[in-house]
Each structure stands twice: as structure tokens, then as C-alpha cells.
Curated annotation (Swiss-Prot):
Cell location: Cytoplasm, Nucleoid
Protein name: Chromosome partition protein MukB
Domains: entry comment: The hinge domain, which separates the large intramolecular coiled coil regions, allows the homodimerization, forming a V-shaped homodimer.
Gene encoding the protein: mukB
One biological process term in Gene Ontology: chromosome condensation
Gene source species: Escherichia fergusonii (strain ATCC 35469 / DSM 13698 / CCUG 18766 / IAM 14443 / JCM 21226 / LMG 7866 / NBRC 102419 / NCTC 12128 / CDC 0568-73)
Chain's role: Plays a central role in chromosome condensation, segregation and cell cycle progression. Functions as a homodimer, which is essential for chromosome partition. Involved in negative DNA supercoiling in vivo, and by this means organize and compact chromosomes. May achieve or facilitate chromosome segregation by condensation DNA from both sides of a centrally located replisome during cell division.
Tree of life domain: Bacteria
Any one cellular-component term (Gene Ontology): nucleoid
Pfam families named in the record: MukB, MukB_hinge, SbcC_Walker_B
Chain positions recorded as ATP binding sites: G34, G35, N36, G37, A38, G39, K40, S41
Signal sequence residues: none
Complex and partners: Homodimerization via its hinge domain. Binds to DNA via its C-terminal region. Interacts, and probably forms a ternary complex, with MukE and MukF via its C-terminal region. The complex formation is stimulated by calcium or magnesium. Interacts with tubulin-related protein FtsZ.
Family designation: Belongs to the SMC family. MukB subfamily.
InterPro entries noted in UniProt: MukB, MukB/SMC, MukB_hinge, MukB_hinge_sf, MukB_N_dom, P-loop_NTPase
């Protein structure tokens, strides 16, 4: 037998009066005895706090607060604690012999609110030897100890092996652990559960009959049947969803016609406009292409006219240009004639001026020689004067320096500085950087010798110059003549050049004599050359017009070829007319054939659409009508097979549903009559008794009872006999077993268990052998397992049945579609594609149009070729007479050759004319050029150089002389020697100064005299040069003017210029006549071009307007196409058969659909607004938006749980198939889901009966409880009259109220509430909804009334009320009720915790002095019988004979208050035994 868990001890740490106190709790009753304020309530408060650490519930009031609505601010807990860390711990041991210490850490929180902080914790695995006080205290010395904080306690326990410490952040987790370990009787999941538990403890603590508990005994004693409520909620949710789906199906069925109408009209409205725009776009494109072709043709014509105009304009421009050139040439020829005449006169002037210049040239040369000699003498005089000046200046400077240095103080310094300066100047002039004062004398001799040598060389050159002066004048005259003829040259080349010039003069005079014959020859050749150029121009013009270059030899053959071409082209033009008529006739035939095919195309397209739909639906491709009929036969066979299979699956599914319904009956009864019989006999079904049997034991018990597994267990078979008489409404075999349903077991049979079977010995001569069933159905677990497998099978069958039903209906609709196709489209569906033939014919029509266009172009080209041939013949007639000139290729070369020879002759004539006189003068004196007389100029340069060298040598010698003279200054001698030396030097300087000044005077006078003579020579030379330059300038001007005239002024030039002018005049007249002809032709051509330009402008305007319209429409069309493709509606809108309707027909179709749509969407604001916007003809994309909006609207209306598609059209097609199947299936499902009212009544009655039996069993434990005059206590459970009436109506008269339960608008709960109101109209339901009332009526607890009754004295059984009982009787009665509640909780929670745990039972009783000794003994007896622990607080006069008693005395010692505790086990005559662990712990350290 499982031992019940017990509370071992209660430990208080740092409570008021208890520093570290452990109370060992008795297994039955623990009594706390003591006077007022001894600490009894504090001890119980510590126990309750550790048990329920919820500050929202804890409230420890005393008797002074009885009847108060609120207690003290701290609710009695803050004042029971001391400052610092406090603990309250419960040491327990459960049924598994596990020691568990649970408790709380408490600590006062500073503040006026007097709050307390609580932290619950639990300790597991603590050794039995460790006391709780040892855990939370630390001994400091013999008289002092310290309380450990919670974190130190945690660390201390973690260090102990095998000990687990848990700290909880929520009370729910704390209580969950206590429930799992068997410390409390009920799982406290919520604050409401904790409140019930606390109210129970509070009622126990303060005693009496608690109104809070007696008013809600149903909540304390009757378990909530959550499974039944959840089953009803799930059923109602399933029914609600089922009904919503059925309602959606009905709405969908009602909307189906609207869907069809809306889709049909929206498709007609949008598709007609869509195809009309597509047709218009194609028409506009065709028109634009036609305009472009006409524009291209007109442009070609205009281009041809422009080419013609350009040719004529070019020819006219050529003639205009030629006319201008001819006019210019004519004017130039006239001007040339005038220029020739002017040049002849100019040539005469030039000859006169040349003679004058020759004379001036001779005089100028003579005067130049005189001036040159004067200049040389002038330069010599200037050099001597300059040297004299320099010498005087140097001497004066030296003399001045000498005078300045006479100062005694500065003489040596000045002389030394002068010496240094002279030495530096000598170094610089002599280029001797190493010169010193000592070596100056040696260098002076060297430089004096250089000065003497330079003077001698200069005098020698001066003598040579005077001798070469005479020879130089003749050489210069001849040299100047050579320079004048040849230009600048070296003097040593003058002899060779002069001889070459004389020989060239002879040749030039010979060439000058041939000028006249060459001119005459050139004039004749130039005339022939002009005629040849004219012929070449005509030939080039002809070749350009023909587009090909021709040789001269080919011209005659070309002339004959062109004449033959003219004849052939005239014949081709006549044949082209007949060919054009044949092409036009074929074009008309093609057009008529295309029209007939376009009429047949819509019918064929409709047949193809139907055929394609059939192919998509069946996944087959049909190539002939025979394939269609064969597939139809296969379809019929497949339909028959599917129907047979569907019926088979449906039958199996119904069988599974029936079995599930049978197994789902409450109590395991497969026959509803058994429930009624069990209720009638006052018994219980055997299957209900074994309802909790496990799945593993189910086969055994099913075989054990065999056919009697559906028996009814009754308390007494003799009482059933009268009910069996005349019983007809029962199964064929009805088994009745006598036994107590509350304590029934299987001992009624003698059983031998075999392998997977049992042998039941029913009687001595009757045995039954039963094997274990493969699928046991005995017990709720076995039935649930079977139901679960059946549900899985039913899901598979339902899915298969739905698939087969869908396939059957789909096949039937496919069969109907094939039948419609055969009746309507089979005749035309497999004919050839008319659109493909139309495309071929259109291609042929385009080819014919192209052929006609090419034919017109060829005819036009032939006419052009005819005109070109005629022009070519005309041109050849002009060219052929001049073929000889064209063949003369050397004519131009001969002209160039004669022209070159003439140019050479004329150049020679000009040379003779220009240099003839100079050559005549040069010839007598040319021999002097053989040798240059000592090269006079070089001699002059050498003379000037020698003068400069002589001057430099003189200066260098003077500088060295000065250094030598100043050598004394470099050595500082005594003053006497320097004075005498200075005196000599002064005298020498003065003498040299006088001589130098005399020399300077003579040089100045000679310079002035010679300068005056040089000025006279220069004046004469300037006069001659001025006259020569003037004449030369005039001659040059005349020559430039003659050159500017650019003509050769010979004797025949004037006659040639006159002939040239007359020829150009004749050419100009011919050119003007041709230009007038071209201007007239050009005027006609421009008029034709103007007409073509106007036509072209109109065509361009029409084309661009059409193109702009096409481009604009294309942008909108692109947006439309993009929208169509993005939304996937192209297949719906692009109806090819509409392409063959006219725009008016399509517009009429769209307008009709628009009228229908306005009515259809009148109630839909969104679609109405979108439809109104779509009526704008300029915004075709809005119609697409409307179509998409319609599709979106329909998609939203489609229930995706019914139709698995987003396409409304496909949804409508599937809707016909799916709706009927879903309606049938959902109706059947609703019938299966809906539980009958009789079943509900039976479930509630069974539950009430079960709970009544349980309460009856609880009452048995209270039969012998007595307190004072109270002899017994019991709970009375009755069914309310109003609810009993409801159950009777549900089970017996439910047919009268089927209007409520069969209504689709009401759930079962609402129907139940309506029935309750109908049966009890006098009851006010308040503001509660029918759903809320119905849910309450589904809870069996609301059907019961519970009250506590006591058997008191002579009054018998009466209702237990505080006013009718004494205080002791009320306390005892209340305690009995609390024991019943605890036991009920244990029974309810047994299935939630481990089966090997029996929870602790403990109650409190404060102020037990109100009970007499007999009542206290009754409590002891009750505790012993129920294995319950009790803690009693009583004054000192209470002395129970059993249990453990603690004497509590509160003492004050040295301002320290503590409670002295002595524990005694029972009261007997013997000496009291002191209990271990009752000695007070050391007092708290001060």
C-alpha cells in the first residue's frame, strides 16, 4: 500500500520571537499550546506563508478584525518578522520516501507601506541527518549565530553533493513542483486555483462553516468536465464551419448565374473593344504603310524630276558658268589686247631709262672710288687723334696722382695702391695673370719688341694699299657688271661667271630671233586644241548622261545600237499594257477569294476554340472526326467505371462512419437501448465501469467477459425482476450482473489465462474459450484507438470519394462538351485553316502588288531609256564629225612643246633686251677679272687689323712701362730715396705730357681738314646716288608694271590678241542661245516638281498624322498589352473570331455589353466606378483595368476551400462539378457532426450520476463524525427542477423542438439556451447572450444544487448554517467539509500525477478552545482514519491525550524577546517525555 506523504517539521528563522526554531510535526495532530501572544498564530502564519507565498492572498487577521472588510496595512505579515533575512521552511517526506524541503525567504522592505519581499525555493536530496536550521544559520560562537542570505544558502547547498537547490520566479512553478512531489493535493495552475486553496486553508485556520466555500461547493467538489465542453465546442466549430461552407456554396450557387453573366458581358465589352482597337491598329498600320508606299513612289517621281532638274540645272549652271567664263574670257581677251598695246608703249620707256642708268652707273663708280680713299684717310686721322687723346689723358692722370700723393701721411699707401692698380691693369691688357713686379721688366722688353713689329707691319701694308689702288678700280668696274647681270657672287668666281655670261648672251640672241615664227605656229595649234576640247566636252557630257565611258572607236557602233534600242523600246511599251491588265485581273480574283475565306474564318475559329478546350480538358490531340467519336466512346466507358468505384468507396465510407458513431457513444455502449435500460434498472453499464481500462489490458477484459461485455451491473438482481416482465425494447441477449458499481471487480468468474486467450469457467459444466480480439473495443482507450484508425481510414476514403466524385462529374461534363462539339462544330473543325490560306493569298496579293509596282517602274524606266537613247543619238550626231580631233592625242603635247619653246625664246629676248648693254661693256674688259689685284678689300681689312694690333701693343707696352716705373712702390724704401725718385718722375711726366699735347693738337687739325674734304666728296656721291636711285626706281616701276601687265610685248602679240577676242565673242553667242533653251525646259520641270511637291506634302501630312496616330495608339496599346500579359487575360480577350467583324459591329457589341454591365454592377460601388472610368474611348487600358477588377472581384467571391483556382472562368466551369458534390458531402457531414439532443441529455445525466455516486462515497467517510449535538454530516446533491425539466425534454420530447436544433442559423449551444428560455419563461436571463447561456447549460455542474446537512439532536437532518449550530459544532462541521474537499481534490488529481504518490494532508485549527474534549477526540479520530495531519492552536487549558503538544511561553530577557518552547508527546500519568529538538536555539546575537 502506498504510504501517504507527511510534513516532518516547520522551521522559523528570524521571526518575531523565533530566531531559529524547528517544530517537529506529528503524524496526526500537533498542538500549539500557550497563552495569549505566545506565538501560536505566528507559527501557523509561517506555515501558511511557506505553503502559499502569494502576497495578494495572505491576510493574517485576528479576532478583533472579524467582520472587517480590510485588515491592517501589512495584512499581518510584516509585524511577525524581524529586520533582516527571514525564512519559513517545511521539511516533508513523500510517498517515494524523498525528502523535500520547501520554503520562502522573507525580508521586510523599508517604507511606510510595510511591504514584504518573498522568494520561494525548494531543496531536494538533503540527507536526513542535516537539520533545516543548520542550513540557513552560521554559528559565530556559543551565544551568537548569523542568518545566511539566500545566495549564500545557494552556494552552500551547491557545494553539497547530491543536493539540488531551486529558486522560483513564479508561484505557479513553485506549486507545480509541490504538486508533482506530492506536497499539495491539487495542481494550482492559476490565481483562481490558489485562491480556492487559500480560502480552504483560511477556513480551516479560523474554523466554522465558511460561507465562501459552502456557496461554491460545486467548484470545490465537482471537477470541471472540460473534455465534454471542448467536444461540444469542437463540434459547434465544425458545424459552424460546415454551415458557413454550405452557406458559401448556396451563395456561390446563387451567384453562379451572376458570375456567368458578369464574365460574359465583361468579356464581350472588353474583348470587343480590345479587338476593335487591334483591328483599327492593323487598319491604321495598313493605311500608314499605304501612305508610306505612295509617299515613297511620289518621292521617287520627285527624285527623278529633281534629278532631271538637277541635270538641266547643272547643264544650265554649266552654260551659265561657261557664259560667265566666256564673258570673262572675252573681257580678258579685250583687256589682253589693251594690255599688249600698253606693254609695247611701256617697253619703249624702259629702253630709254636703261640707257640713262648706264651713264649714271659709270659716274657713280668713279665717285665711289674717290670717297673710299677719303674715308680711309679719315679713319687714319681719327685713330691718331684718339691715340693722342688717350696718351694725354693717361699722363694727366699720372701727374694728378703724383700731386695727390705728396701728402706725407698717405704717400706710401697711395703709391702702393697705384702700383697694384698698374700691375692689375698690365695683367688685364697683357693677358698675363702671373705677372709680378719683378718680371715686369722682362715682359716690357718683349712687348716693346711686339710694338715695334706691329708698327713696321702697318707701314708695309699702307705702302701696298697705295700701289693696288689703281688696279682695283678696273677690276671693280668689271666685277660690278658681272654682279649686275648674274647677281651676288664671290670675287674669285667673277672670271668664270663672266665668260659663261658672254657665251650665254650669244645663245640668247640666237633664240630671240625665233620668237615670231613660234608665235604663228602656236596660234594654229591652239585653235585645233580648242576644237578638240569642245569635242571632248561633248563626249564627256554624253558619257555622263549614259552613265558609262566609251572609247572613240565604239561611238559609231554605239550610234547604231542606240537606234536599234529606240526601235525595241517602242515595241516593249505596247506589250506592257497587256501584261498589266493580266496582273490586275488576278489581283481581283485573289481579293474575292480572301473575302469568302474571311467569312468562313470565324466559324472555323469557334470550332477550333471548342476543339482546343476539349483537348486541354482531356489531354488528347484530335486530328479527325473519327478520333473525336472514338474518344467519346472511351469517355463513356471510363464514366461507368468511375461511377462503380465511387459507389463502392461511398459504401465503405458509410460503413466506417456508422462504426465511428457506434464507438463514439458515451460509456462504450454500442446500443442506445442499453443506456435507457441501465438508467431504468438503476445500474451501470459494464463497459462504463471498465471505461478507464488501459489499451494493453483491453484485449484481456474483452475476452474475459465475452458476449457479456455489454452487460448492465445492478446492485440487486431481485429488484430488476419486475422490470424484465414485458420488456421488448432490448437487445436479443441482455446480460445482467449483480455487484456494486463503485467497487466492482472481475472476481465473478473463474478464469484461466492462456496464450492470447482465456478460458472462463461459467459453471461446473460450462466453459467458454475466448481469444484476445485483434481490434479490442473494450474500454475508452481501445475505442479511441479504433476510432483514430477509423478516422484515418475515413479521411483516405473521403479524399478518394471526393476525387472519384469530381472525376465522375468532370467526365459527365466532358461528355456533354463532346456532344455539343459534335452537334455544332464537327463539320468544320477539321477543315483546312482559312487563316493560313488567307495569309498565303495575302502574300500572293502583296507579290502581285509588288509585281504591278515593278511593272510600272519598269515601264517608266523604259520610257526614260527611250528618251535617253534619243538624246544619245542627237549627241553622237554632233560628236562623230570630230572623231579625227579626238583621236589626235599628241596635239596637246605639241602645243605645250611650242609654248615652251616660245617661252624660252621670249625669255631670251627679254634677257638680251635687259642685259645686252652690260654684256657689250663687259666684253672689252673681261680679261681684268682673271686676277684680283691683291684682293684690295682683304688688304684694307689687314691694314685695319694691323692698326688695331699696333694700338694694342702700344697700350700693353705703356702699361708694362708704368709697372716697371712703379716697381719702387712695391718695396717701401726710405723717404729720401722716394722723394728723389718722385722728383725725377715728376719731371719726366711733365715732359711727356707736353709732347703728347703737341701731338694731339696736330692730329686734331689734320682730322678737321680731311673731314671737310670728305664731306665734299660725300655730297657729290649722294647727288649721283640720288639721281641713279631715282632712275633705277622708275625703271623698276616700269619693269614691274610690264610684269604686272603679264604680256609679251612683241610685234605679233597685238594681232594674236585681236584674233582671240573675236573667237570668244562667237562662242559666247552660241552659249547664250543654248542657255535660253535650258531655261525654258527648266521652267516646265519646276512646274512639274511643284505639283509633285504639293502632292508629296499632302501625303507626308497624311502619313505623319497617321503615323502619329499609330505611334500614340502603340504607346497605349503597349500599356494595354503589358497590362493584359501581366494579369494573364490575353487568352480571354484576344478572340480571333472578332477580328473579322467590322468596327461598327464591334462597337455595337461593346455598347450592348456596357448597358448590361451597368445593370449588373449597379450594386457594386467599386466596379461601378471602374466601369464609369473605362468608358473613356481615349483610355483603352481602363477597360482592361475594369476586366481585371471584375476578375479580381470574382476571385474574391470564390471560396478557395471550394474551388481551387484563381481563374473565375475556370471556377465557373468547376463550380458546376464541385457544388453538388460539396453540398451532398457537407450535408452528410453536418448530420454526422450534429449530436442529438437525446445524446446530450444522456451525457449530462451520466456525468451527474457519476458525480452523485462519488459524493455518496465521500459521505460514507463522514457518517460517524459527531461534534456536540451533531451526530453526522453529509453533502446533499440534487438536480435543479428547471434543469431536470430541460433534460426530460431533451431525451423524451425533443421532436417537439426540432425547429431549434435543425436551424442552420443557431448553434447547438444557442438552440439549448432558446429551449431553456422556452421552458422557463419566468427566469430573467439578464444581459447574457444565448451562446453564453448555452455553454453554461452544457456544464453539468450548473444542473446540481449542493448543500451541507447535519443530523443534530432531535431536529434530524437540517441544513448546516452557522446560526443553527454552536461554535464548536460549526467548527467541526466545517472541518468535515474541508476534509471532504481535500479528498475530492486528491481523487480528481490522481490521474495527473504519478500513481505511486499519495499527497500530504494537513489542516489547521486556531483557537481550538471552542471545542470540547469529545469534539477534539473526534478530530483525532478523523485524522487517524483519513491519514491527515492537523495543527491546533489552543490555550494552556487544552491537554489532548494524543499527538504532539508544544508549550509556548514568550519571555523578555535583557530587552530581548523570545519564545520558549517545550514539546511533549501525549498526556499520560507517566512523566512527560521531552521530544528531541525542542530546546530553543541560541538567541539571536545582539
Amino acid at each position: 500500500m502506498i504510504e501517504r506523504g507527511k510534513f516532518r517539521s516547520l522551521t522559523l528563522i528570524n521571526w518575531n520571537g523565533f530566531f531559529a526554531r524547528t517544530f517537529d510535526l506529528d503524524e496526526l495532530v500537533t498542538t500549539l499550546s500557550g497563552g495569549n501572544g505566545a506565538g501560536k498564530s505566528t507559527t501557523m502564519a509561517a506555515f501558511v506563508t511557506a505553503l502559499i507565498p502569494d502576497l495578494t492572498l495572505l491576510h493574517f487577521r485576528n479576532t478583533t478584525e472579524a467582520g472587517a472588510t480590510s485588515g491592517s496595512r501589512d495584512k499581518g505579515l510584516h509585524g511577525k518578522l524581524k529586520a533582516g533575512v527571514c525564512y519559513s521552511m517545511l521539511d516533508t517526506i513523500n510517498s517515494r520516501h524523498q525528502r523535500v524541503v520547501v520554503g520562502v525567504r522573507l525580508q521586510q522592505v523599508a517604507g511606510r507601506d510595510r511591504k514584504v519581499d518573498i522568494k520561494p525555493f525548494a531543496i531536494q536530496g538533503l540527507p536526513m541527518s542535516v537539520q533545516p536550521t543548520q542550513l540557513v544559520t552560521e554559528t559565530l560562537n556559543e551565544r551568537q549565530a548569523r542568518v545566511l542570505p539566500l545566495n549564500e544558502l545557494k552556494d552552500k547547498l551547491e557545494a553539497m553533493e547530491g543536493v539540488q537547490f531551486k529558486q522560483f520566479n513564479s508561484i505557479t512553478d513553485y506549486h507545480s513542483l509541490m504538486f508533482d512531489l506530492g506536497i499539495i493535493a491539487r495542481r494550482l495552475r492559476s490565481a483562481s486555483d490558489r485562491s480556492k486553496f487559500y480560502r480552504l486553508i483560511e477556513a480551516s485556520l479560523y474554523g466554522g462553516i465558511s460561507s465562501a466555500i459552502t456557496r461554491s461547493l460545486r467548484d470545490y467538489l465537482l471537477p470541471e468536465n472540460s473534455g465534454v465542453r471542448k467536444a461540444f465546442q469542437d463540434m459547434e466549430a465544425a458545424l459552424r464551419e460546415n454551415r458557413m461552407t454550405l452557406e458559401a456554396i448556396r451563395v456561390t450557387q446563387s451567384d453562379r448565374d451572376l458570375f456567368k453573366h458578369l464574365i460574359s458581358e465583361a468579356t464581350n465589352y472588353v474583348a470587343a473593344d480590345y479587338m476593335r482597337h487591334a483591328n483599327e491598329r492593323r487598319v491604321h498600320l495598313d493605311k500608314a504603310l499605304e501612305f508610306r508606299r505612295e509617299l515613297h513612289t511620289s518621292r521617287q517621281q520627285l527624285a527623278a524630276e529633281q534629278y532631271k532638274h538637277v541635270d538641266m540645272a547643272r547643264e544650265l549652271a554649266e552654260h551659265n558658268g561657261a557664259e560667265g567664263d566666256l564673258e570673262a574670257d572675252y573681257q580678258a581677251a579685250s583687256d589682253h589686247l589693251n594690255l599688249v598695246q600698253t606693254a609695247l608703249r611701256q617697253q619703249e620707256k624702259i629702253e630709254r631709262y636703261e640707257a640713262d642708268l648706264d651713264e649714271l652707273q659709270v659716274r657713280l663708280e668713279e665717285q665711289n672710288e674717290v670717297v673710299a680713299e677719303a674715308i680711309e684717310r679719315q679713319e687714319e686721322n681719327e685713330a691718331r687723334a684718339e691715340a693722342a687723346e688717350l696718351e694725354v689723358d693717361e699722363l694727366k692722370s699720372q701727374l694728378a696722382d703724383y700731386q695727390q700723393a705728396l701728402d706725407v701721411q698717405q704717400t706710401r699707401a697711395i703709391q702702393y695702391n697705384q702700383a697694384i692698380a698698374a700691375l692689375n691693369r698690365a695683367k688685364e691688357l697683357c693677358h698675363l695673370p702671373d705677372l709680378t713686379a719683378d718680371s715686369a721688366a722682362e715682359w716690357l722688353e718683349t712687348f716693346q719688341a711686339k710694338e715695334l713689329e706691329a708698327t713696321e707691319k702697318m707701314l708695309s701694308l699702307e705702302q701696298k694699299m697705295s700701289m693696288a689702288q689703281t688696279a682695283h678700280s678696273q677690276f671693280e668696274q668689271a666685277y660690278q657688271l658681272v654682279v649686275a647681270i648674274n647677281g651676288p657672287l664671290a670675287r674669285n668666281e667673277a672670271w668664270d661667271v663672266a665668260r659663261e655670261l658672254l657665251r650665254e648672251g650669244v645663245d640668247q640672241r640666237h633664240l630671240a630671233e625665233q620668237v615670231q615664227p613660234l608665235r604663228m605656229r602656236l596660234s594654229e595649234l591652239e585653235q585645233r586644241l580648242r576644237e578638240q576640247q569642245e569635242a571632248e566636252r561633248l563626249l564627256a557630257d554624253f558619257c555622263k548622261r549614259q552613265g558609262k565611258n566609251f572609247d572613240i572607236d565604239e561611238l559609231e557602233a554605239l550610234h547604231q545600237e542606240l537606234e536599234a534600242r529606240i526601235a525595241s523600246l517602242s515595241d516593249s511599251v505596247s506589250n506592257a499594257r497587256e501584261e498589266r491588265m493580266a496582273l490586275r485581273q488576278e489581283q481581283e480574283q485573289l481579293q474575292s477569294r480572301i473575302q469568302s475565306l474571311m467569312q468562313r474564318a470565324p466559324v472555323w475559329l469557334a470550332a477550333q476554340n471548342s476543339l482546343n478546350q476539349l483537348s486541354e480538358q482531356c489531354g488528347e490531340a484530335f486530328s479527325s472526326s473519327q478520333d473525336v467519336t472514338e474518344y467519346l466512346q472511351q469517355l463513356l466507358e471510363r464514366e461507368r467505371e468511375a461511377i462503380v468505384e465511387r459507389d463502392e468507396v461511398g459504401a465503405r465510407k458509410n460503413a466506417v462512419d456508422e462504426e465511428i458513431e457506434r464507438l463514439s457513444q458515451p460509456g462504450g455502449s454500442e446500443d442506445q437501448r442499453l443506456n435507457a435500460l441501465a438508467e431504468r434498472f438503476g445500474g451501470v453499464l459494464l463497459s462504463e465501469i471498465y471505461d478507464d481500462v488501459s489499451l494493453e489490458d483491453a484485449p484481456y477484459f474483452s475476452a474475459l467477459y465475452g458476449p457479456s461485455r455489454h452487460a448492465i451491473v445492478v446492485p440487486d438482481l431481485s429488484q430488476v425482476t419486475e422490470h424484465l416482465e414485458g420488456l421488448t425494447d432490448c437487445p436479443e441477449d441482455l446480460y445482467l450482473i449483480e455487484g456494486d458499481p463503485q467497487s466492482f471487480d472481475d472476481s465473478v468468474f473463474s478464469v484461466d489465462e492462456l496464450e492470447k486467450a482465456v478460458v472462463v469457467k461459467i459453471a461446473d459444466r460450462q466453459w467458454r474459450y475466448s481469444r484476445f480480439p485483434e481490434v479490442p473495443l473494450f474500454g475508452r482507450a481501445a475505442r479511441e484507438s479504433r476510432i483514430e484508425s477509423l478516422h484515418a481510414e475515413r479521411e483516405v476514403l473521403s479524399e478518394r470519394f471526393a476525387t472519384l466524385s469530381f472525376d465522375v462529374q468532370k467526365t459527365q461534363r466532358l461528355h456533354q462538351a463532346f456532344s455539343r462539339f459534335i452537334g455544332s462544330h464537327l463539320a468544320v473543325a477539321f477543315e483546312s485553316d482559312p487563316e493560313a490560306e488567307i495569309r498565303q493569298l495575302n502574300s500572293r496579293r502583296v507579290e502581285l502588288e509588288r509585281a504591278l509596282s515593278n511593272h510600272e517602274n519598269d515601264n517608266q524606266q523604259q520610257r526614260i531609256q527611250f528618251e535617253q537613247a534619243k538624246e544619245g543619238v542627237t549627241a553622237l550626231n554632233r560628236i562623230l564629225p570630230r572623231l579625227n580631233l579626238l583621236a589626235d592625242d599628241s596635239l596637246a603635247d605639241r602645243v605645250d612643246e611650242i609654248r615652251e619653246r616660245l617661252d624660252e625664246a621670249q625669255e631670251a629676248a627679254r634677257f638680251v633686251q635687259q642685259f645686252g648693254n652690260q654684256l657689250a661693256k663687259l666684253e672689252p674688259i673681261v680679261s681684268v677679272l682673271q686676277s684680283d689685284p691683291e684682293q684690295f678689300e682683304q688688304l684694307k681689312e689687314d691694314y685695319a687689323y694691323s692698326q688695331q694690333m699696333q694700338r694694342d701693343a702700344r697700350q700693353q707696352a705703356f702699361a708694362l712701362t708704368e709697372v716697371v716705373q712703379r716697381r719702387a712702390h712695391f718695396s717701401y724704401s726710405d723717404s729720401a730715396e722716394m722723394l728723389s725718385g718722385n722728383s725725377d718722375l715728376n719731371e719726366k711726366l711733365r715732359e711727356r705730357l707736353e709732347q703728347a699735347e703737341a701731338e694731339r693738337t696736330r692730329a686734331r687739325e689734320a682730322l678737321r681738314g680731311h673731314a671737310a674734304q670728305l664731306s665734299q666728296y660725300n655730297q657729290v656721291l649722294a647727288s649721283l646716288k640720288s639721281s641713279y636711285d631715282t632712275k633705277k626706281e622708275l625703271l623698276n616701276d616700269l619693269q614691274r608694271e610690264l610684269q604686272d601687265i603679264g604680256v609679251r610685248a612683241d610685234s605679233g602679240a597685238e594681232e594674236r590678241a585681236r584674233i582671240r577676242r573675236d573667237e570668244l565673242h562667237a562662242q559666247l553667242s552660241n552659249n547664250r542661245s543654248r542657255r535660253n533653251q535650258l531655261e525654258k525646259a527648266l521652267t516646265f520641270c519646276e512646274a512639274e516638281m511643284d505639283n509633285l511637291t504639293r502632292k508629296l506634302r499632302k501625303l507626308e501630312r497624311d502619313y505623319f498624322e497617321m503615323r502619329e496616330q499609330v505611334v500614340t495608339a502603340k504607346a497605349g496599346w503597349c500599356a494595354v498589352m503589358r497590362m493584359v500579359k501581366d494579369n494573364g487575360v490575353e487568352r480571354r480577350l484576344h478572340r480571333r473570331e472578332l477580328a473579322y467583324l467590322s468596327a461598327d459591329d464591334l462597337r455595337s457589341m461593346s455598347d450592348k455589353a456596357l448597358g448590361a454591365l451597368r445593370l449588373a454592377v449597379a450594386d457594386n460601388e467599386h466596379l461601378r466606378d471602374v466601369l464609369r472610368l473605362s468608358e473613356d474611348p481615349k483610355r483603352p487600358e481602363r477597360k482592361i483595368q475594369f476586366f481585371v477588377a471584375v476578375y479580381q472581384h470574382l476571385r474574391e467571391r470564390i471560396r478557395q476551400d471550394i474551388i481551387r483556382t484563381d481563374d473565375p472562368v475556370e471556377a465557373i466551369e468547376q463550380m458546376e462539378i464541385e457544388l453538388s458534390r460539396l453540398t451532398e458531402e457537407l450535408t452528410s457531414r453536418e448530420q454526422k457532426l450534429a449530436i442529438s439532443s437525446r445524446s446530450v441529455a444522456n451525457i449530462i445525466r451520466k456525468t451527474i450520476q457519476r458525480e452523485q455516486n462519488r459524493i455518496r462515497m465521500l459521505n460514507q467517510g463522514l457518517q460517524n463524525v459527531s461534534f456536540g449535538q451533531v451526530n453526522s454530516v453529509r453533502l446533499n446533491v440534487n438536480v435543479r427542477e428547471t434543469h431536470a425539466m430541460l433534460l426530460d425534454v431533451l431525451s423524451e420530447q425533443h421532436e417537439q423542438h426540432q425547429d431549434l436544433f435543425n436551424s442552420n442559423r443557431l448553434t447547438f449551444s444557442e438552440a439549448l439556451a432558446k429551449l431553456y428560455q422556452r421552458l422557463n419563461p419566468q427566469i430573467d436571463m439578464g444581459q447574457r447572450t444565448p451562446q453564453t447561456i448555452g455553454e453554461e447549460l452544457l456544464d453539468y455542474r450548473n444542473y446540481l444544487e449542493m448543500e451541507v446537512e447535519v443530523n443534530r439532536g432531535s431536529d434530524g437532518w437540517l441544513r448546516a448554517e452557522s446560526g443553527a449550530l454552536s461554535t464548536g459544532e460549526a467548527i467541526g462541521t466545517g472541518m468535515s467539509i474541508l476534509v471532504m474537499v481535500v479528498q475530492s481534490w486528491e481523487d480528481e488529481s490522481r490521474r495527473l500525477r504519478g500513481k505511486d504518490i499519495s499527497p500530504c494532508r494537513l489542516l489547521f485549527l486556531d483557537e481550538a478552545a471552542r471545542l470540547d474534549a469529545r469534539s477534539i477526540a473526534t478530530l483525532f479520530e478523523l485524522c487517524e482514519r483519513l491519514q491527515m495531519q492537523l495543527i491546533i492552536a489552543a490555550p494552556e487549558n487544552i491537554s489532548p491525550e494524543k499527538g504532539t503538544t508544544y508549550k509556548l511561553v514568550r519571555k523578555v530577557f535583557q530587552n530581548t524577546e523570545h519564545v520558549h518552547v517545550v514539546g511533549l508527546r501525549g498526556f499520560t500519568p507517566q512523566l512527560p517525555e521531552t521530544l528531541p529538538g525542542t530546546v530553543d536555539a541560541p538567541s539571536e546575537a545582539s
